[in-house]
Amino acid sequence: MTLPASLKGFETLDIFNISSVRNICELNKHAEHVSIKNLPLIDISVGNDDVWFHLEDGTIVNGKSYKSICEKTLGFLGFIGIILLDSEDTLEEIRLSKTQCKRRIIYLILKEDTEFLLCGIVYALENLPIKGQTLLKLRDIIKKISVTLPVSKLLACTCQKLISILRYIFYDDKQQDVLDKVPPIIQLYYESKTANIHMLNLFFKSHDNDDTCTLSLNTRRLQDDSKYLIDFLKSAICDAFSKEYKMTEIEKTSLH
């Protein structure tokens, strides 16, 4: 397992506790052009102790068979993601410079069905509306998944963390096992934000709140860039791959 240089000083156990792999996208090749796109998931459900992915074409597939779906997709090269420390996502911006962000982009080389399943779950947790009971069922299923490889451990820990954040923000779940997985910076930001809203409502009798909270990083900005993250990533990936599909600008990082 090769980690970005900025993370190499931590013990392995610490890495899984304080970092996540976020903003997972598909990497695709068409002719000589390499690009990224969203996963084709529009919903996620849990039934019969299995995770089910609802795809754009109307089909519903068992999460464990998602690997075969991906491998049959024309031009599919794998997934990319971004390694973030807990202190770097404030729910408003990403506390990375453009240079730092490039070094955090990882090319996920996956082999196991479970790894594809976990990538799909991470994407769903960040981008899709998910019911509270579904979150609880997902949490229970992920706990039962046997993970041995570093990439699987990181993806599973990311799923557990995102589930806890969603439970905390959208369902006001403040049980200790939930709070233990919610990064302190998110707790601080969210509590201060809700306190300000309560104060405004108290004095001005206003219950309107247009500030919606989302875990998707696509519309977040980096510290020194006015671009949305998704636009930055598209540009970085385009620059990174030559016609022979070799990494140039960004440091290619494999978790295997």
From Swiss-Prot:
Keywords: Host cytoplasm, Host Golgi apparatus, Virion, Virion tegument. HAMAP family: HSV_CEP1. It is found in: Virion; Virion tegument; Host cytoplasm; Host Golgi apparatus. GO terms for cellular component: host cell Golgi apparatus; viral tegument. Pfam families: Herpes_UL7 (PF01677). The keyword Cell membrane does not apply. Belongs to the herpesviridae cytoplasmic envelopment protein 1 family. Plays a critical role in cytoplasmic virus egress. Participates in the final step of tegumentation and envelope acquisition within the host cytoplasm. The gene is U75. Its main location: virion. This is Cytoplasmic envelopment protein 1.
